[in-house]
Amino acid sequence: MPSTVAPVKGPDHFLNLVFPERVFASYMSPLAQKHPKAALYIASLAGFIFGLLKLITFPVLCAAGLFVFPIKGIISSLCHRRLDACSGYMLATFLSLFSLALIIVGIVSCVAWAPEFIFPIISIGMALATTETCFQIYTHLFPALEHKPSSPLKIENTTTKLSRSSSAPDLSCPSLSTQPTSPNQSLSAYKKY
């Protein structure tokens, strides 16, 4: 019996490590469907708190990914007895290495910048981290519903309704008449006002 679950790719491994709240949100999705308002309040609060902590946890989790992903890749390839099972983990390892290198370059380059420039950059980074954390929580807490295509008959009825409503005159304006008029009648209508 084939599995219907989509395989987890390398970027998903990386994002699941760096944003652990998205894994938790996907587990809590059925409960969030029952209580959407409470879930939104909790998700907003969690996104704000975790977003502020992202400036500290992001580099730490990227460094942890340099050790965790190769080990998971080796174990996965040994369990499945094929080498392509570890390709997602290798990509996640390179993403962790690249992210950590960008963070180190950013910190080293901040030494040469003026404090008036560094503090707004930190503020923008915190805002982006909070926004991304809220986005990750929300998209995994409330997954998109599958859209079923409607029948051609319903689409045809909808388009005919739209064409009828767009060609109808605006009856709220008293100067517009619903009957076709001659040029003399239209001039007499303007003379009244």
From Swiss-Prot:
Membrane topology, as annotated: Multi-pass membrane protein
Keywords noted in UniProt: Cell membrane, Membrane, Transmembrane, Transmembrane helix
Residues spanning the membrane: 40-56, 63-79, 86-110, 117-138
GO CC term (a single one): plasma membrane
Region of interest: Disordered: 158-193
UniProt keyword annotation of Membrane present: yes
Main subcellular location of this protein, as a coarse class: membrane
Pfam families reported for this sequence: DUF5422
Entry-linked InterPro entries: DUF5422
Record has Membrane as a keyword: yes
Cell location: Cell membrane
Top-rank lineage group of the source organism: Bacteria
Annotated family: Belongs to the chlamydial CPn_0442/CT_006/TC_0274 family.
Protein name: Uncharacterized protein TC_0274
Protein source organism: Chlamydia muridarum (strain MoPn / Nigg)
